[in-house]
Amino acid sequence: MLIIETLPLLRQQIRRLRMEGKRVALVPTMGNLHDGHMKLVDEAKARADVVVVSIFVNPMQFDRPEDLARYPRTLQEDCEKLNKRKVDLVFAPSVKEIYPNGTETHTYVDVPGLSTMLEGASRPGHFRGVSTIVSKLFNLVQPDIACFGEKDFQQLALIRKMVADMGFDIEIVGVPIMRAKDGLALSSRNGYLTAEQRKIAPGLYKVLSSIADKLQAGERDLDEIITIAGQELNEKGFRADDIQIRDADTLLEVSETSKRAVILVAAWLGDARLIDNKMVELA
């Protein structure tokens, strides 16, 4: 497994792979890898000849400096996990390598609408940072496919739109959420939970499933469903942050023509902001 830290070396390897006619898959990550990331890697390996995993804690997508400062950097352990998975290439650049003149004056990619609604409204600049780094990685790695987790539902929708709008010839693969046995969605942020909070955390998925059950039973008073769900989260020890029920295909308000809904939930548990989602077919 190659570990590359500079743009010239990465370009050199990508040129070689292209000359050899290899099908390349990219898995963009911020490191601190868990089994959910490994599921992305496995999906990439099944679909391509060569798998490139990027590990870069992107300062442009953090709306709070303290979050950036405390985000775990575990490059050695991450590379050991990826080596066991037989990943071909790890791209682990420094911030200086990606943003040589800093982030303030760096060219950015913005996806109007999707970047400022829902999760984007509570995290200003976050999705602009995501679309900028992902587009830069697409230009550098030139993958045939790229794999992203469905846990970050809005992020996946944003990347699909960016790819369509910018004409990237890349297949975007959404990989289903991987959960612990108790239902908690795997996330790097779960590491912020205390032992006691970890026992409470599966309650998020229980509330999510309760909303889904109501929708499947034909309930359509979305405001009431959301209000009750927020109360349930708070009673379980969370601080409900945002609960939305949206059209799964557009992320707009659910309408009579909506065929699928996505339930998007964000809640604080101690210092960890947990997010989860669930899709529901609307009869």
From Swiss-Prot:
Activity as a function of temperature: Optimum temperature is 30 degrees Celsius. Stable up to 37 degrees Celsius and loses activity almost completely when incubated at 60 degrees Celsius for 10 minutes.
Name assigned to this protein: Pantothenate synthetase
InterPro entries: Cyt_trans-like, Pantoate_ligase, Pantoate_ligase_C, Rossmann-like_a/b/a_fold
Binding site for beta-alanine: Q61
Keywords of the record: ATP-binding, Cytoplasm, Ligase, Nucleotide-binding, Pantothenate biosynthesis
Enzyme class: ligase
The EC number(s) this enzyme carries: 6.3.2.1
GO cellular component: cytosol
Catalysis: reaction(s): (R)-pantoate + beta-alanine + ATP = (R)-pantothenate + AMP + diphosphate + H(+)
Subunit structure: Homodimer.
GO biological process, one term: pantothenate biosynthetic process
Disulfide linkage: none
Amino-acid positions noted as binding ATP in the UniProt annotation, renumbered to this chain: 30-37, 149-152, 178, 186-189
Residues of the active site: H37
Pathway(s) of this molecule: Cofactor biosynthesis; (R)-pantothenate biosynthesis; (R)-pantothenate from (R)-pantoate and beta-alanine: step 1/1
Biophysicochemical property: pH dependence: Optimum pH is 10. Stable from pH 5.0 to 11.0.
Family under the similarity heading: Belongs to the pantothenate synthetase family.
Activation and inhibition: Activation requires a combination of a divalent cation, magnesium or manganese, and a monovalent cation, potassium or ammonium. Above the optimum concentration for activation, magnesium and manganese are rather inhibitory. Also activated by 2-mercaptoethanol, dithiothreitol, cysteine and glutathione. Inhibited by divalent cations (mercury, cobalt, zinc, copper, silver), chelating agents (EDTA, EGTA and o-phenanthroline), and analogs of beta-alanine (taurine, gamma-aminobutyrate, gamma-amino-beta-hydroxybutyrate).
Gene assigned in the entry: panC
Gene Ontology molecular function terms on file: ATP binding; identical protein binding; pantoate-beta-alanine ligase activity; protein homodimerization activity
